[in-house]
Amino acid sequence: MTHLRDSGAAAGRRPLALVYRGPASSPGCPEAVAGLLSSGPWNLDVRFTGPDEALPLSAELLSQALLYAQPGGGTLDSAYRRLRRRRRAIRDFVRDGGRYLGFCLGGYLAGATPGFGLLPGDTDQYISSPGATIHEESDTLITVTWRGRPRTVFFQDGPLFVLDEHADATVLATYDNGAPAALVTRFGHGRVAVTGPHPEATTDWYTDHGLPVHHTLDLAMDLVESVMES
């Protein structure tokens, strides 16, 4: 099959971006990611994929896409049980030149224990890490250093990223304990961008939990730009 990510532009089609929506995501998370991808300068054809969507997630569907986004959701073990049959398809998609974009749970799933194994390393729970300043799983705010600047971002039990020694990865943001909070790396011919916090969070995420609103769409755009690079 011809890969849309290789031929779509030449054929005059908008590149296809798939956003998972289903039992391994939480309400509002896929929609926020889809809104981000639709509002950016990338001219993407953004579609939801999942067991109850018009486009079920499959290797054939992924072969037509440029980007696959895994949004926030519930627990890692539960989500992986629902997605493990798609592990090989997702890995092949990225290895062949696709882009993987993971937010919070999507970041955890990019790891290996369990996960899709897309990172030069693994993930761990920030709130249980040494030096963490947040220890609860509830929705809250966290301050990270994003490209050298402190920024306050929506957060809900997101991962930190544990990189292998000499890993080929660009850390975009760090937590206050120095652990990577967002990064971009290569996997085969493709690229992977992941974040523990939620820079894609919309205003209602903050107001629904009584939190001061912080506008972080520029950080989410930076994450997408980083994974879209050649």
Language-model regions: role of each:
Residues 76, 80-146:
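A glycine-rich, often tryptophan-bearing local segment used as a flexible ligand/cofactor-contacting loop or short
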Residues 136-200, 205:
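Catalytic beta-strand/loop cores that center a nucleophilic Ser/Cys/Thr
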Residues 66-72, 101-102, 192-196:
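Structural motif
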Residues 18, 101, 117, 172, ...:
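Hydrophobic/aromatic beta-strand patches that form the interior of the parallel beta-sheet core
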Residues 1-64:
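N-terminal beta1-alpha1 cap of cysteine-dependent amidohydrolase-like domains
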Residues 24-25, 74-76, 107-109, 123, ...:
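Short, solvent-exposed loop/turn segments at secondary-structure junctions
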